[in-house]
A protein has these predicted regions:
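C-terminal non-catalytic scaffold/interaction domains in large multidomain proteins
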Residues: 1-169
Length: 169
């Protein structure tokens, strides 16, 4: 996947999906993230084509943080984010957090071609593990803490990308 991304300045999510079928493998998002930025649901671009003002973006993210974490989908307005030549959205935010942020990290159970999920936490904060972020989200919910209800809730609030997660007990 990294080799594909290195040889394509731009490529689409559909092209990656087709590649995964041709290779008969899952999509290795970590390899893609090494050399590309997902700038929208449909488009990935080379890291060489985008320049983030990391401190400014981190400052905007910090303005959304009122506790130890926020769900990535809680950032639903991108007007305050600095211009980077592409319109800001949750996919670009996910890429920024994975590859660029100095202050924040995205905790999730993996990336998805169709969804952005997880929690944004401070790198020097109390929450270090994805399971701890899920526990914090569930502790603030009013659901009965049974595994199926917890999984449904975490999927509904975009903490997990699918309604299964083996490490949730």
């Amino acid at each position: 996947y990294q080799l594909y991304a290195k040889h394509h300045a731009e490529f689409t999510a559909d092209e990656i999906y087709i590649l995964s079928k041709e290779l008969d493998t899952v999509i290795y998002f970590d390899a893609l993230s090494e050399v590309s930025v997902r700038v929208s649901h449909d488009l990935f671009v080379s890291k060489k084509r985008i320049n983030f003002d990391v401190d400014s973006v981190d400052k905007v993210i910090e303005s959304f943080m009122s506790k130890d974490y926020i769900r990535i989908r809680e950032i639903d307005s991108f007007l305050a984010f600095p211009s980077v030549g592409y319109e800001w959205n949750e996919y670009m935010l996910e890429s920024f957090l994975i590859s660029y942020s100095k202050k924040f990290v995205l905790l999730n159970n993996g990336q998805s071609l169709h969804n952005v999920a997880g929690a944004i936490v401070k790198k020097d904060g109390k929450i270090k593990e994805f399971e701890d972020a899920c526990a914090a989200v569930l502790s603030e919910s009013r659901i009965e803490l049974k595994k199926s209800e917890a999984l449904n809730y975490l999927a509904d609030v975009n903490m997990i990308t699918r309604r299964s997660y083996k490490d949730l007990d």
